[in-house]
Amino acid sequence: MTGIAAASFFSNTCRFGGCGLHFPTLADLIEHIEDNHIDTDPRVLEKQELQQPTYVALSYINRFMTDAARREQESLKKKIQPKLSLTLSSSVSRGNVSTPPRHSSGSLTPPVTPPITPSSSFRSSTPTGSEYDEEEVDYEESDSDESWTTESAISSEAILSSMCMNGGEEKPFACPVPGCKKRYKNVNGIKYHAKNGHRTQIRVRKPFKCRCGKSYKTAQGLRHHTINFHPPVSAEMIRKMQQ
């Protein structure tokens, strides 16, 4: 073997720990050294660096600069990139979703609207003692035995028909009773006047009369009075009273 051939042979021979293995190319030798003789444990590397802090062996540098290391790094990038894109797209889509406006109370739940009844169509948002429902008035007991009561006969239709349609009118709601010149700024004012302003001027008959002398305007009012004050007497109760 010539000197050049011997030098070439020994140049690709592993000398780590008396290994002595020969490789055809330098790349194969480096790969062998990296896989079998270089410890990649961080604790071992840190210990070696503390023992020899002035320099780093070229084999450790080549460990991170070889084609195999670069291919591994590219593979990791390809695996991470789709996950990153999916995360970004999902965060953007969540950011575009509009949330429903909150109410002043802070709840997403819409406020409950009370049911509208015929008697509440002209009811004030802040009802006063003058704004009883018509059905509630029917249930009230009569204060006397007479079959007449006083009540305003001004209906909601009459109030609306008397409303001034001129937008510049300060008090558009006028009382429809002939001779009355009262005017009001809102429907609550004219409603209160309609129920109280002419109460003593109009008499309404209460045709439904109880045997006790109480009179009511409707059969419903009389029935409510009878159920509460004159309940039917059962046969068993009559027998107990006769004993």
UniProtKB/Swiss-Prot annotation:
GO annotations of cellular component type: cytosol; fibrillar center; nucleoplasm; transcription repressor complex
Q: Which GO terms describe its biological process?
A: lipid metabolic process; negative regulation of transcription by RNA polymerase II
- Tissues expressing the protein: Expressed in range of tissues with highest expression levels in testis, liver, muscle and fat and lowest levels in kidney. Detected in liver and white adipose tissue (at protein level).
Tagged with keyword Nucleus = yes
User: Gene3D superfamilies this protein is in?
Assistant: Classic Zinc Finger (3.30.160.60)
Q: Where does it live in the cell?
A: Nucleus
UniProt modified residues of type Phosphothreonine: T109, T113
- Looking at the record, which segments are called Disordered? 89-151
Q: Where is the composition biased (Low complexity)?
A: 118-130
PROSITE patterns cross-referenced by the UniProt entry: ZINC_FINGER_C2H2_1 (PS00028)
Q: What is this protein called?
A: Juxtaposed with another zinc finger protein 1
Gene name as annotated: Jazf1
